[in-house]
Amino acid sequence: MAVKYTGPFLAAIFCLAAATSALAQTDEIQVYDASIAPKGVFNLTLHDNYTVNGSSKPAFPGALVPEHTLNGVPEWAYGVTDWFEAGLYLPLYSVSSNKGAVVNGFKLRALFVDPDAADKPFFYGINFEFSYNAKHWDESRYSSEIRPIIGWRFGKIDLIFNPILDNSYKGFSRLDFAPSTRIDYNISDKWAVAAEEYDDFGPIRHFLPGSQQSHQLFAVVDYSGAPVTVAGGIGFGLTSASDKLVLKLILSKDLN
């Protein structure tokens, strides 16, 4: 997804019907705002995050150690229509403190949005991702994400909520609830500052105890201009189960 600053949906969620670890790492730290590449345009977004201070133990046997590990992925997107964007994440990669440089798999994405979301006071969408995972990246070979997008604009302030469900195909009750939230202030048409929160409450059948949940708060600066769009941030863990200090960088550019 380019970085810029209903009934069928419910049926799809039930059909896709799991928990993932609250300590699981991610290649993408981003709140979706329902913006997509224009019709006929290819976009490339580079996602990277580095855990400066985090867990020194793997989330499961054979997994990567989060601390001092770089995770990232190129995201290749194409605007199919004014309401649908297709995406491919390839390759997911890490340079880890315990396994060195590794490839983690790939993801396919289908993003459906309200057209021209950037010009509307209320906007919405939904994103579906399907992942093939290396054994060191996720305990499940196949997983997916269901990400609804809900947002409001109040002048120069945007409020966006992504109530994400992560799915490892182990039953509906084991879907993992991992929402993300963003509030930003648009200083100009090119610059914005934001606070983003990324949470993982655990499986919807029974949330994890508070001390085992992951909650991170990021301070973010966005630049939307030439030659590339940039989003950089620093994140702080709010619970003992969260990585304590994480840096993220997102670079995005239309290719045609």
Model region roles, listed by residue range:
Residues M1-L10:
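Bacterial N-terminal signal peptides that target proteins for export
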Residues A19-S21:
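N-terminal signal peptide c-region/cleavage motif recognized by signal peptidases
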Residues L23-N256:
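Transmembrane beta-barrel domains of Gram-negative outer membranes and organellar outer membranes
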